[in-house]
Amino acid sequence: MKTIIALSYIFCQVFAQNLPGNDNSTATLCLGHHAVPNGTLVKTITNDQIEVTNATELVQSSSTGRICDNPHRILDGKNCTLIDALLGDPHCDGFQNEKWDLFVERSKAFSNCYPYDVPDYASLRSLVASSGTLEFFNEGFNWTGVTQNGGSYACKRGPDNSFFSRLNWLYKSESTYPVLNVTMPNNDNFDKLYIWGVHHPSTDKEQTNLYVQASGRVTVSTKRSQQTIIPNVGPRPWVRGLSSRISIYWTIVKPGDVLLINSNGNLIAPRGYFKIRTGKSSIMRSDAPIGTCSSECITPNGSIPNDKPFQNVNKITYGACPKYVKQNTLKLATGMRNVPEKQTRGIFGAIAGFIENGWEGMIDGWYGFRHQNSEGTGQAADLKSTQAAIDQINGKLNRVIEKTNEKFHQIEKEFSEVEGRIQDLEKYVEDTKIDLWSYNAELLVALENQHTIDLTDSEMNKLFEKTRRQLRENAEDMGNGCFKIYHKCDNACIGSIRNGTYDHDVYRDEALNNRFQIKGVELKSGYKDWILWISFAISCFLLCVVLLGFIMWACQKGNIRCNICI
């Protein structure tokens, strides 16, 4: 029985070797491109989902969880807000004259001095934050006739009653509080920021005890502006044992201008000025820890890499950051259209070209050749067309990043309740900008993906046409990305086709002769496969009949015994 099976196998192998297409006088050369078993889906202008061999994610969706201290100078506010550090709250004395690129305010920050409010809090905070320094210069104001350096038990500096270190609380001297009229010129060539305030006592008695007059007034003027504040006497909610308040105001004095302060009571006077600097410093609210690392882009969630053009970590950023978009993912095609290779190529192992499917396992190039000739089969990459495609795709990601990365920061906006309508408008504008950028990002990526796929398809077609021009009438286009070569073409011949040195004149006569001989006996392609399968089926049927007849004859002669058990 084993002998019969072995003979049958040998018969089929011989039969297969004699099939058309296995003639040693011809060869098959196929062109193809790289493919992978599982590609990546990307979006193009014409297709929402198209599979490519490789793609790069463009949206940064996670942070490091910490704020990197390099290359930006980070100042951790710890328990202090920027305004408390500016005013000189006793527990913020460590921030005097500090500098920063980014001031990080913590949610745990608190005030620990006299209760105050800042009518234009957001503007003052933004102004000081962008200046990037708390550098302070004392000036010799002349406050004749009043007592200086007032303090409060609500503002302890050590065991002693104290006050904001950058402000001077003035109150009556003996039983008088004269009208104060003090000037301070700006003879320097930079802007000066003066912080001052108005005290609002909780009762009329407190008002007269401190300032004699039943109603005070504070006027601060420059050549460009004037502010007059009338104190509002009356009780307020208790904070740190006090129901009185201080309102904080600020004035910028330009070079050559003069600061004029006029008051008959309730003045919280400046001790000097802050030097206003122009720069790109900023402030951010975050509870992320500050770590030793390097990152150009910072968000409240922590630092993020800026090697991608988009991010959806946070709208608030500082530094050179990817553009914020709503999408969680945007994939940029960095490979060609993926057509996974078919695992079965028929019973005789035929090869196929790029029109049918891609080729898996081409690790040394994107485009290449497969051949079948008298010496067997082989595969080689075409490095020139591969490099042409890669050169055009390389740098695509960098170009997208250059178009989208912000070289500035986006700070959070703060508004008082009075500015609610402005806040709503600002939110609408920001949301609209994000919607537009999200749409633009998706469109940009889709356009780039379309270009990449068209480009890689074009390189494949260029290689195919180049090969066709070399072979001319020596080969026939089989319609699947392959050529049937009508002359004997060994591996050296195949190599000359690949490297562009093939001389079709050398093989022209042989190819024409073989073409006419093969065409003379070759059936039309519409019937060839049917005849092949029918002849194979008949051969197998006859083989089975012969085998069955032999078994029956052997049983009759007693050479084979068959036992049937029930």
Swiss-Prot record:
Write out the S-palmitoyl cysteine lipidation residues. Answer: C555, C562, C565
> Which residues bear the site annotation Cleavage?
R345, G346
Glycan attachment residues as annotated in the record = N24, N38, N54, N79, N142, N181, N301, N499
Q: Where is the secretion signal located?
A: 1-16
Subcellular location per the Swiss-Prot or TrEMBL entry: Virion membrane; Host apical cell membrane
Look up and give the membrane topology term: Single-pass type I membrane protein
Q: Which InterPro entries match?
A: Capsid_hemagglutn, Hemagglutn_HA1_a/b_dom_sf, Hemagglutn_influenz_A, Hemagglutn_influenz_A/B
Taxonomically, which superkingdom? Viruses
Q: Per its record, how is this protein called by name? A: Hemagglutinin
Q: What gene does the UniProt entry assign to this protein?
A: HA
